[in-house]
Curated annotation (Swiss-Prot):
Disulfide bonds join C23-C286, C105-C184. It is a multi-pass membrane protein. G protein-coupled receptor for peptide hormones apelin (apln) and apelin receptor early endogenous ligand (apela), that plays a role in the regulation of normal cardiovascular function and fluid homeostasis. When acting as apelin receptor, activates both G(i) protein pathway that inhibits adenylate cyclase activity, and the beta-arrestin pathway that promotes internalization of the receptor. Also functions as mechanoreceptor that is activated by pathological stimuli in a G-protein-independent fashion to induce beta-arrestin signaling, hence eliciting cardiac hypertrophy. The chain crosses the membrane at residues 35-55, 74-94, 107-127, 150-170, 212-232, 249-269, 285-305. The gene is aplnra. Glycans are attached at N19, N180. This is Apelin receptor A.
Amino acid sequence: MEPTSEYTETYDYYDTGYNDSGCDYSEWEPSYSLIPVLYMLIFILGLSGNGVVIFTVWRAKSKRRAADVYIGNLALADLTFVITLPLWAVYTALGYHWPFGVALCKISSYVVLVNMYASVFCLTCLSFDRYLAIVHSLSSGRLRSRATMLASLGAIWFLSCLLAVPTLLFRTTVDDTGSNRTTCAMDFSLVTLNQDHESLWIAGLSLSSSALGFLLPFLAMTVCYCFIGCTVTRHFSHLRKEDQKKRRLLKIITTLVVVFAFCWTPFHVLKSMDALSYLDLAPNSCGFLHFLLLAHPYATCLAYVNSCLNPFLYAFFDLRFRSQCLCLLNLKKAMHGHMSSMSSTLSAQTQKSEVQSLATKV
């Protein structure tokens, strides 16, 4: 099965296109206008929201919990990713023409995949931290130490960067002389020129990224929450104040996981179905492949929405985060008022000086 020249897949990071079976893979025209607008909206909300989260976590050093550190790193991953969205917005608006060169094609694609891995790994560590704090509250002191937390953060970023390396190797710009455009796509000519082998590479990398970046971590999170649910239910009748705080934090993290699953599941399902079609393990009809082509940009957009939702979830569920944000806003107002006061004082002093100078001259 060889990729069609009509359309080069831009959303699936381990895919070069849909199978060439003589079908018409024409894109839905409104997507060229709608998708860039959605990307820029996610960019604006994600940049401001995650910036506030990072600053809030950094500022509250004395009250920082282990969960806050993971949340801060989750926001950092999302912030790094949303910075690339203007490039993808322009790319889509130009009809999938990439004008930014090979380096930005590789780097921006790499950042997208690093974000996917780092986000799900941070959520997995958050879930495991809650599992230890609630199910093994008396015996998990060493596992929840600062050194262990820093080691897990190092492992998260190392694994995320490592697992995304195939994008750096294979993602490049491809000139399409037929449509007079340059696409940012996967090119496996470094490892094979055989179309069947290329299909295996596409399917293998696509399925492995979905397994490692979604399915296995989500299963681990599900197991953690099953144990947590049993423990919380068992001790529901006599919760101490400290336990109530744990429950509030648990509610926030559970919401983050559920929203993450809601946003990313359609993307991984469509990506896996496309990968299986390369292996002839899924329908290979024109209608099915055309459905994947039309649905994939919007499934991708839904996945990207997750990067701007988390700050609003913190603000809605976490009273402490809300109060810290209000303190931040009050600090800004105070600084603005102080600057205005200084400006007024300087202006008055300047006017007084000018009057004195004029009186001297007269």
